[in-house]
Amino acid sequence: VVHTVTSPESGLHAAGEDAIRLARELVRRDSTNHGGGQGDERAAAEYAAEALGEAGLDPLVLESAPRRANVVVRVPGTDPSASALLVHGHLDVVAADAADWTLPPFAGEIADCPVTGVPALWGRGTVDMKNTVAMVAAVVRHWSRHGLRPRRDLVLAFVADEEDSAAYGADWLAREHADLFEGCSVGIGEGGGETVHARGTDGRPVRLYPVGAAERGSAWLTLRARGTAGHGSRPPRDNAVGALADAVARVGRHAWPSHLTPVTLDAIDAVAKALGVERSPGDTATDEAVDALVARLGEAAPLIAPAVRNSATPTMLSAGYKVNVVPGEATAGVDGRVLPGAEAAFESTMDALTGGRVDWEYAHRSPAVSAPVDGAAFAAIGAALRAHDPDAHVVPMCLSGGTDAKVFSRLGIDCYGFSPMSQPEGLDYSALLHGVDERVPLDGLRFGVRVLDTFLRS
């Protein structure tokens, strides 16, 4: 007999402890992605597959290249007419230098957080994003123990290479194994669902839960200037280094105009309403007015600020091989981020900023994506959060960076950033992303398990 009622709280408590154990073991399996194809997710993938196998599932471990492993499994639902839901997360992590950490980054130790005093799991990947992989696995293991099933099919995809190009992970799966995602219309992954503490205009505490509903596109650019090579004592008029330096300086100084997408406008409205910030028709009339409005959102301003305009950040320079030799070519790398609908404006602006002496081209490009915030999926996310935090204010968000949602969106899947995690006040959770002493509160994992259980069976 399949029971579809809410599982006993005692069972979910055990699932929360299971998530903590699974997360510790995943952290202990070093899956550092060094970039450029240098990574090894195999041990983490095998452990995740073993955990899912213990729930009666038959996961596939798929290698796109030696040791670049991905795990995919379908969890059958009770309603074959319902579209499937994709739940994606990545197994790779960024590098960590143990000398900089208070506790070893791959030991999976539990210790109190020095900021909040609450017990936390420390280690690389506890925030990004082995925590979510562990929570999802714990939920389906809980279902197996209690005879529970979701209403719709779930496709779980724990992938490689998100921290670099996705070439060995989501991108490879979407190209070579698209059939595994058949029937998926909605997906959830990283990029939202964590508590953001703020204060209303009257001083009352407000708990916001931003949910990713859009992502700026990635536009990694190579700028190239060419000139006459020669001796440093006889400088040419067309010095490539000087031309490139001028262009890079213009790019770095440029004040990009505001470009408010529907998701960002919805986010501003939702945050302002939650905080009691009054709005007026002129709030978005000019760039200055937009910036002033965002500033009035106080602690919530960082949720909105990166999503109101395009950006282009110079990050790399390369020229020459010897100080007394004028190089014939100089290059720069620029990290561009482009809002939905602002691609043409971005390109024309880069043309103007680089000028006639410097060419630019895309080194890597992934378009911006967005998903509906007025449909059943976003409503179900909000309902699940409010079921376990009645005072939750769920707000849409446009992510400043990017996730594997960009890849899975190509398959026609509406993707949301939803990795639920309660956070104590005073902890800057987002600052721990890729940071030293990355850690997640144990109660945050327990909360996430409860919310995911509700959402994934809704």
Region spans (language model):
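Acidic, glycine-rich active-site loops and adjacent beta-strand->loop/helix elements
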Residues: 91-93, 157-166, 190-195, 229, ...
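N-terminal helical capping/dimerization or prosegment-like subdomains
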Residues: 2-98, 329, 333, 343-347
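Active-site-proximal alpha-helical scaffold in enzymes
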Residues: 130-148, 164-175, 240-246, 250
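Short, conserved micro-motifs enriched in small and acidic residues
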Residues: 119-134, 163, 238, 439-446
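A glycine-rich helix N-cap at a beta->alpha junction
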Residues: 175-193
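Beta-strand segments within the central parallel beta-sheet cores of soluble alpha/beta enzyme folds
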Residues: 151-159, 185-188, 263-265
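Metal-dependent amide/peptide-bond hydrolase catalytic core
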Residues: 2-6, 193-214, 218-447, 453, ...
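Active-site metal-coordination/substrate-binding segment of hydrolases
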Residues: 82-155
